[in-house]
Amino acid sequence: MLKLIIYLRPAARYFLIAWLLTIIIVSSIPNIPTLKIHTAGKEIRLDYLMHFCEYGVLTFMAFLSIVGKEFKIHFRKVLLIAAGLIMFAILDELHQKLIPGRSYNIKDMMSNVTGIMVVTVFTVVLFRMIKDKIVQEK
């Protein structure tokens, strides 16, 4: 897994751009039905999980696209990227108010932000592991 991440790092910017465009395009489609699982007397919405994963992938791609070969990342960059991604998530939800059949949903936005925060922590820990492995191999 670590070797795959190291291998994909040089192309991460292209993946990031593609993922950003995908988010913008999909969030601009009018009248998308909400995916739900119906259980005995309960309905579970899958769109919150999808928002979490969508912004988790975006976060990982953003960090992978800016990190160098040594996988060192400064705390200031972590904060700036996380803040930028949160702003993008908010703007993405707000822009949906302009799309017919779509609306601003605070729960969607919270799922986006939660995905960003969880994957930010995961990525920082993962990059430290990769950095330590690179140092050991030298």
Can you describe what each PLM-predicted range is?
Residues 1-65, 81:
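"…centered on the first transmembrane helix and the immediately adjacent amphipathic helix/loop
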Residues 3, 133-138:
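Short, charged juxtamembrane terminal tails flanking transmembrane helices
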Residues 18-27, 77-97:
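Small-polar-interrupted transmembrane alpha-helices in polytopic inner-membrane proteins
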Residues 41-46, 74-75, 107, 111:
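Juxtamembrane helix-capping/reentrant segments at transmembrane boundaries
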Residues 33, 37-38, 90-113:
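Interfacial helix-loop-helix junctions of multi-pass membrane proteins
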Residues 53-69, 114-130:
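Membrane-interfacial alpha-helical segments at the cytosolic side of multi-pass membrane proteins
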Residues 10-14, 71-80, 105-106:
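Membrane-helix interface segments
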